[in-house]
């Protein structure tokens, strides 16, 4: 009885859906009038030779599943009604026979729990019969619901680890390249600074000794203080004008520079010679070349030999 009720519920739901899709009433579908009307229209379109039955259904906006449902429902309802009438008849006869037996035979009251829940049996393949492919779809949904969350978690964790590792490698490479580039830039700037710097071979100790000797000799002279006194005296205006005129005349005529404009050098200035050909090439003296190449990370074979010679000498093996 439970299976029959389940089938009736499914039938009512199907009737509602088909009635909504096609616009046909449920009474017309159950009585077979809808099927007769559809068959008449299909026959009219087919006899004209314009299209086939499938094309006619598509033209009317009705799918083959809906047409099959409309054609099956009247037969199913008629058979179900006959089966229900037969079941009622059998049930009535059974009830009569049961009453006669209870009257004739004294039976004890059963001790089974009268409040026990009854579950209607349903064929697992019933839904797949009416709706092909439903069981496979439900199985796929159950599978995804069971392990889909774990799969997404594992895939997300793997992707996150890959992103972190790749980002770490990229950052390490970028920092390493930036450090090397900045180091090379600094060393290149230092090398160019050394090339363009004014180099002087200083003789400061000798200058200090000469100054001390000059001080000692001046102290020994009796008239040094007097000469210094007259030398430090200021010039009167006529003498100052005459001195300025001589200085300007000598400087304008390309004469020698007065001693007051000559700066005492603390050493010997090293002169650098540029390349003869205008090729914008860098020129470095031989004595500075090992230093410049060392800043760029290259050591000439000659300098390597010098380093080996200046290093600790190995003891010669006696023969």
From Swiss-Prot:
Covalently attached lipid (N-myristoyl glycine), positions: 2
> Pfam families, from UniProt?
Polyoma_coat2 (PF00761)
Q: Where is the signal peptide?
A: none
Which keywords does UniProt give here? Capsid protein, DNA-binding, Host endoplasmic reticulum, Host membrane, Host nucleus, Late protein, Lipoprotein, Membrane, Myristate, Transmembrane, Transmembrane helix, Viral penetration into host nucleus, Virion, Virus entry into host cell
The transmembrane segments are 287-307
For the region D1, what residue ranges are annotated?
A: 266-301
The disulfides recorded in the entry are none
Q: One GO molecular-function annotation for this sequence?
A: DNA binding
Instruction: Provide a GO CC annotation, any one.
Output: host cell
**Sequence motif Nuclear localization signal, location on chain:** 311-319
InterPro entries in alphabetical order: Polyoma_coat_VP2
Single GO BP term: viral penetration into host nucleus
Residues annotated as region DNA-binding? 306-319
The family line of this record is: Belongs to the polyomaviruses capsid protein VP2 family.
Its recorded name reads: Minor capsid protein VP2
Q: Which organism is it from?
A: Murine polyomavirus (strain A2) (MPyV)
């Amino acid at each position: 009885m439970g299976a029959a009720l389940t089938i009736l519920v499914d039938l009512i739901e199907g009737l509602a859906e088909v009635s909504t899709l096609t616009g046909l009433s449920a009474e017309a579908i159950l009585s077979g009038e809808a099927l007769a009307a559809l068959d008449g229209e299909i026959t009219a379109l087919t006899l004209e030779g314009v299209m086939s039955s499938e094309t006619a259904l598509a033209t009317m906006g009705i799918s083959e599943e809906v047409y099959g449902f409309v054609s099956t429902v009247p037969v199913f309802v008629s058979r179900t009604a006959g089966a229900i009438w037969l079941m009622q008849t059998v049930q009535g006869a059974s009830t009569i026979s049961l009453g006669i037996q209870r009257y004739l035979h004294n039976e004890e009251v059963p001790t089974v729990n009268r409040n026990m829940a009854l579950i209607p049996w349903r064929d697992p393949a019933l839904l797949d019969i009416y709706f092909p492919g439903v069981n496979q779809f439900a199985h796929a949904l159950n599978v995804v619901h069971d392990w889909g969350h774990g799969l997404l978690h594992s895939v997300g964790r793997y992707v996150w680890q890959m992103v972190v590792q790749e980002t770490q490698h990229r950052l390490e490479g970028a920092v390493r390249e930036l450090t090397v580039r900045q180091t090379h830039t600094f060393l290149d700037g230092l090398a160019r600074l050394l090339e363009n710097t004014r180099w002087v071979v200083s003789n400061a100790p000798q200058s200090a000794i000469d100054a001390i000797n000059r001080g000692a000799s001046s102290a020994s002279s009796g008239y040094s203080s007097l000469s210094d006194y007259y030398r430090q005296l200021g010039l009167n205006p006529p003498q100052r004008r005459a001195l300025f005129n001589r200085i300007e005349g000598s400087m304008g005529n390309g004469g020698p520079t007065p001693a007051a404009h000559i700066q005492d050098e603390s050493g010997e200035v090293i002169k650098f010679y540029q390349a003869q050909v205008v090729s914008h090439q860098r020129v470095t003296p031989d004595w500075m070349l090992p230093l410049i190449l060392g800043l760029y990370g290259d050591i000439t074979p000659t300098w390597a030999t010098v380093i080996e010679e200046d290093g600790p000498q190995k003891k010669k093996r006696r023969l």
